[in-house]
Amino acid sequence: MSVLAEILDGVRADLAAREQQTPLADLKQRVERVPDPRDALTVFRNSPVSVIAEVKRSSPSKGKLAAIADPAALALDYEAGGAAAISVLTEGRRFGGSLADLDAVRRAVDVPLLRKDFIVSPYQVFEARAHGADLVLLIVAALDQPRLVGLRERIESLGMTALVEVHDEAELGRALDADARLIGINARDLRTLEVDRATFARLAPMVPPGVITVAESGVRGPHDLLAYAAAGADAVLVGEAAVTGDPRQTVADLVAAGAHPAARVGR
C-alpha cells in the first residue's frame, strides 16, 4: 500500500468518527455564524511572489519536525514576517495537526488560512469553513474527477478558494479540467517522498494565464523562492524550513526575496 493510500485510510476512519460526534446539520449551522471568508486570490494577485507559511509538526518524509506547543504564537510570527497566508495542517496521524490548531490560528491572525488536509468529503469542506478556513487543499491524486469537481464547487459555494495540488502532467490536466483557479505544483513525489524541484519548472509553463501557481516543497530559503519565481511561481509554500529555523526571520527573508525585481523575471 502506498503512503498516500495509508494516509487516506486513516483520514476516512477519523472522518467517520467526527461525523458521528458532530452531525453535518450542526456544522452547517456553525458555518452560518462565522465571519465571511477572506479573498485569498486577490491577496495573491496583489502581492509580488507571495509566501504561504505552514504550521507543521511532522511529516511522513521527515518524521517529527517541531513540537509547536502554541500554533497561534507561530502564526503571529509568520504574520509579522509578512506571510500572505498561513497553511495549517489538520491531519493528525502523520502530520500531528488538528482542527484545534486551525481554531487557534484563526483567533490569532487576520491573513487568509488554508486548511491543509486530505479532503475526500464535503463534510470536511464544511468543517474547514466552520473553523475559519479561507482556502482548502484538494489533492488530485487522492480524488477521482467527479469528486474533485464536486469538492471544488462546494468549496467555492462557501466563498472559499480551492488550492488544487498536482504532481505531474496528467494531474495538471485534471486540475485545469476541474476549473481550478489556484494550482499548487508539489515537487515531492507521493510514491518516493523525494523532492525534485525540476517538477515545477516542467509543469508551470502548462498553466494558462490567469491561473495562480503555487510552488510546494523544496523551499529552503530565498534562492529556492527565486528559482521557483523564475519558473513562473506566483507564490511559494514553506513548512519545514520555517518550523525548524527562526520562523519570523525565515518568512521575512522569503518575503524580501519575493519582492526583489529578480523574482519578477519569470512572471
UniProtKB/Swiss-Prot annotation:
Q: What class of enzyme is it?
A: lyase
| Reaction catalysed by this enzyme | 1-(2-carboxyphenylamino)-1-deoxy-D-ribulose 5-phosphate + H(+) = (1S,2R)-1-C-(indol-3-yl)glycerol 3-phosphate + CO2 + H2O
Give the molecular function GO annotations.
Answer: indole-3-glycerol-phosphate synthase activity; phosphoribosylanthranilate isomerase activity
Q: Which UniProt keywords apply?
A: Amino-acid biosynthesis, Aromatic amino acid biosynthesis, Decarboxylase, Lyase, Tryptophan biosynthesis
Keyword Lyase assigned to the entry: answer is: yes
TM helices/strands, residue ranges = none
- Could you confirm whether the keyword Ribosomal protein appears in this record? no
* GO BP annotation list: L-tryptophan biosynthetic process
Protein's pathway? Amino-acid biosynthesis; L-tryptophan biosynthesis; L-tryptophan from chorismate: step 4/5
Its family remark reads:
Belongs to the TrpC family.
**Protein name per the record:** Indole-3-glycerol phosphate synthase
Organism per entry = Frankia alni (strain DSM 45986 / CECT 9034 / ACN14a)
Q: What is the lineage of its organism?
A: Bacteria, Bacillati, Actinomycetota, Actinomycetes, Frankiales
* Gene designation: trpC
